Amino acid sequence: MDFSRRSFHRSLSSSLQAPVVSTVGMQRLGTTPSVYGGAGGRGIRISNSRHTVNYGSDLTGGGDLFVGNEKMAMQNLNDRLASYLEKVRTLEQSNSKLEVQIKQWYETNAPRAGRDYSAYYRQIEELRSQIKDAQLQNARCVLQIDNAKLAAEDFRLKYETERGIRLTVEADLQGLNKVFDDLTLHKTDLEIQIEELNKDLALLKKEHQEEVDGLHKHLGNTVNVEVDAAPGLNLGVIMNEMRQKYEVMAQKNLQEAKEQFERQTAVLQQQVTVNTEELKGTEVQLTELRRTSQSLEIELQSHLSMKESLEHTLEETKARYSSQLANLQSLLSSLEAQLMQIRSNMERQNNEYHILLDIKTRLEQEIATYRRLLEGEDVKTTEYQLSTLEERDIKKTRKIKTVVQEVVDGKVVSSEVKEVEENI
């Protein structure tokens, strides 16, 4: 129940004048308080109405009239006071009902004991373990795929290396074939030379035989004259010597050609052996480097997969906590707004209660004063004022405080507080 304006006026005055020489006689001036109440308890005012009573020469009759008016005013005041006391009791009952409702609301919205989510926690842990197993399996599959790719790359490199070795050996064989062809041509030339020398030797033998035969024929027709002369040349021996000489030369050239071919072959074989050993050492180093690279690549992939899973888990945790923080922030804002509303209601009801209690106290004081007046305790000859309560304006204001917060990802980015004061 709202009271926008309450004013109380109370003044009692009594005056007793000496009789004057007139037909009017004695006059008595009194004040009778009256209470005005608006709709819904608004604009309640207790004011005084002034009554003028004319007395004649008979003071006894005037006193009875004064007593009757006072009784009627007190009866009217008592009736109105009873109605206001009834309103006060009604407001107290409504206040107690509101207190009960507030208590029930606190009991209803108070944080309760949490449910038993242990079964759900177990399911969540099982699902998390399954997710981790699946992530590990995926990581293993990725590592196997990477290992297969690395093995394929290794085999491809081996193939390229073997292909290069084969091309090198083929090039060496082609060079050796050229050398062999050169040696074959040189051997053929030597054989041709030997054949020509054999032909020359045969021709020389034939000519020598013809000469010998001619000499025999010539000697057969002539006289045998023995002359003591130096022995003649033996052409057969000479031819044999020439043949042996040319055979030795041919054998020597052939041996030199063979030795040169063997030397070149040995040099090439040594070069091939050295290159093969160097290639094998390089291949061993390359294999070790590949193994190291594969192990490092596998370790890198495992760390990357672990990092990715941890980042994903961190993002999920951040999102979950951000949503929970936003929910808690909204709940806190709503609870603060409700608490502010409840506090404002309680303050308003407390003010109303104190105002009504003040009204009740003052009315009881007025009733006691009127009772003393009726009993004749405070009758005096002079006019006096018992108490005067100046009209006062009781203004009640309502202050509404609005808190606007902008929450992004669970963090308060901006906060704005607005206060609005309203007259009730």
From Swiss-Prot:
Source species, domain of life: Eukaryota
Q: Residues where Phosphoserine occurs?
A: S13
Q: Which residues form the IF rod domain?
A: 70-381
Linker 1: region residues? 106-123
Q: Where are the annotated segments for Head?
A: 1-69
PTM summary from the entry reads: Hyperphosphorylation at Ser-13 occurs during the early stages of apoptosis but becomes less prominent during the later stages. Phosphorylation at Ser-13 also increases in response to stress brought on by cell injury.
One GO BP annotation here? cellular response to starvation
The entry lists its GO molecular-function terms as: structural constituent of cytoskeleton
- Keyword Phosphoprotein attached: yes
Q: Subunit info?
A: Heterotetramer of two type I and two type II keratins. Associates with KRT8.
| Identification of the protein by name | Keratin, type I cytoskeletal 20
